């Protein structure tokens, strides 16, 4: 749904900002943030996962152009944001010009936090 569209009850959706914790405030005790400069140019893989499904090999081999794959998430449900394969946040899919994007709506806290 775009910002200009109305929700099911006929009202424009309310858009709220998300307050994310400052990374420096979440560092474990004894970690010196001045050493982070060495890591700033390290690349990490960021993946946005719309959903998952499981299929038998025969079904996968039978796929062709036009095959529709149903995923385990509903349309409009938050998507998972992973860094190097580990879920770190949830977000909502947005369209920016002609590209897809993701607006972060929740940062997943680790067990240590």
From Swiss-Prot:
One of its GO terms (cellular component) is bacterial-type flagellum basal body. Gene3D superfamilies: SpoA-like (2.30.330.10). Transmembrane segments: none annotated. It is found in: Cell inner membrane; Bacterial flagellum basal body. The keyword Cytoplasm does not apply. Belongs to the FliN/MopA/SpaO family. This is Flagellar motor switch protein FliN. The lineage of its organism: Bacteria, Pseudomonadati, Spirochaetota, Spirochaetia, Spirochaetales.
């Amino acid at each position: 749904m775009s910002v200009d569209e109305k929700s099911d009850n006929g009202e424009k959706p309310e858009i709220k900002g998300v307050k994310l914790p400052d990374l420096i405030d979440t560092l474990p005790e004894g970690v010196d943030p001045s050493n982070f400069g060495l890591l700033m140019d390290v690349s990490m893989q960021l993946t946005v996962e719309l959903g998952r499904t499981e299929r038998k090999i025969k079904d996968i081999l039978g796929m062709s152009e036009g095959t529709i794959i149903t995923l385990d998430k509903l349309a409009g449900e938050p998507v998972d944001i992973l860094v190097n394969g580990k879920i770190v946040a949830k977000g909502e899919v947005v369209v920016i010009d002609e590209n897809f994007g993701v607006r972060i709506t929740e940062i997943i806290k680790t067990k240590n936090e």
